[in-house]
Amino acid sequence: KLELYDLSAKGYKEVVLVGIDLSSYGKDIGCHLVDAVTMACTTEGIERVRLGSLEPLMLTDKNLSILAGLPNFCPQFHLSLQSGCDATLKRMNRHYDTAFYRELVQRIRSRFDNPSITTDLMVGFPGETQEEFEQSLDFAREIGFAKVHVFAYSIRPGTRAAKMPDQLTRQQKEQRSHQMAQVTEESRKSFLQSQVGMVESVLFETEKLDGMQHGYTKNYTPVCVQSDRELCGSIHSVRITGAKDDYCIGQLLTEQEQAE
């Protein structure tokens, strides 16, 4: 809490809670991650609180209700997935399946205003057949992630997976990485396009460069606006007017527009 007050006093408007296993925060001290989020959201001067990567099982109905009731909480959910195929998830020893994940995404989208869902997807895990890979592709298309980090499985000596049979070749993994990236990039473009026409608060994080200034909405959509004003470190209402490959373009609202 003292660190939050210190950050607020220094003018920071957004904090991001991160950790190697963020979802397990507080288990050793008798509290829960949502307690830390609530504390951060109610710290004077802190206008935004964002979370790092989360395990899907952490987001119970109770926890979602608490988060949805915090105005300063940023509705960007980076939900661990790894694969969109149940057979692969089972070999990975994941404790959720695609049905659970799908239903969780639906609950998030019904409870939060304009949330974004991001994730990591691995291809080429030992034993991944072409059919399993295609199931993962289809699931990624279905969910429509705002952004995905795609990566190929690599052997780590001493792990259970390293000893599994049916290791894929480098060529197979590279090919699947390329295919998955193509699918998720299309989802990314669709998500950015869906933001056009919306009015969002944007925290500007970079100084002027050729008259363009860059920032992020609460759901972590990157937005670029043209302005002669110094916006870095401040939050402004922006109407999103267009979408590029990896960011949106917007216009600052005038005081009159904000009052309407």
What are these regions (language model features)?
Residues 163-260:
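Terminal RNA-binding accessory module
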Residues 9-130:
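Conserved SAM/AdoMet-binding glycine-rich loop
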Residues 128, 142-145:
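Contiguous mid-protein beta-loop-alpha structural module that forms a pocket-lining wall or clamp
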Residues 54, 91, 148, 225-226:
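Thr-Gly-centered strand-to-loop micro-motif
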Residues 1-24, 62, 77, 99-110, ...:
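Proteins enriched for Cys/Gly/acidic motifs involved in redox and nucleic-acid/cofactor modification
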Residues 17, 51, 79, 120, ...:
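Conserved, mostly hydrophobic/aromatic
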Residues 26-41, 45, 92, 155-186:
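Radical SAM enzyme [4Fe-4S]-AdoMet core and its adjacent flexible, acidic
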